[in-house]
Amino acid sequence: MANPHQIYRHDAAWDRQVFRSLATSLILHGHIKTTLDRAKRLRSVVEKLITKAKKNDLAARRQILSFLYGLKTRDGVKVMPYLFNKVAPRYQERNGGYTRIVRIPSRLGDNSKMAIIELV
């Protein structure tokens, strides 16, 4: 993988918004399809969020709420309660490694390497 600073030539605000959106979608849906480089960077973001959610204290809730889109829903399910009540309890006995990256064929339009990132 090339230097990440050369891959993403956007400002920090753009990076933050993209990875907020990707992390929120991954938590709600369990898997998403994205480019391989974004999947690799998203893995560290999501694993840190799940580790914080496992603590389940007020400080962890506030830190996660400041990062995720808390009001985004899927079929009426809000992401914050879903993360703390459904996702985090699944990984109480697991120390990291909450995600899996599966490579898929390249995108036809620009031949970008694609991957599916999913919660284990």
Curated annotation (Swiss-Prot):
BP GO terms, sorted: translation
PROSITE patterns with a match to the protein in the record: RIBOSOMAL_L17 (PS01167)
Keyword Ribonucleoprotein applies: yes
InterPro entries named in the record: Ribosomal_bL17, Ribosomal_bL17_CS, Ribosomal_bL17_sf
Keyword terms of this UniProt record: Ribonucleoprotein, Ribosomal protein
GO MF annotation terms: structural constituent of ribosome
Any Pfam family: Ribosomal_L17
Gene Ontology CC entries for this record: cytosolic large ribosomal subunit
Domain of life of the organism encoding this protein: Bacteria
Subunit structure: Part of the 50S ribosomal subunit. Contacts protein L32.
Family: Belongs to the bacterial ribosomal protein bL17 family.
Protein name: Large ribosomal subunit protein bL17
Organism: Mesomycoplasma hyopneumoniae (strain J / ATCC 25934 / NCTC 10110)
Originating gene: rplQ
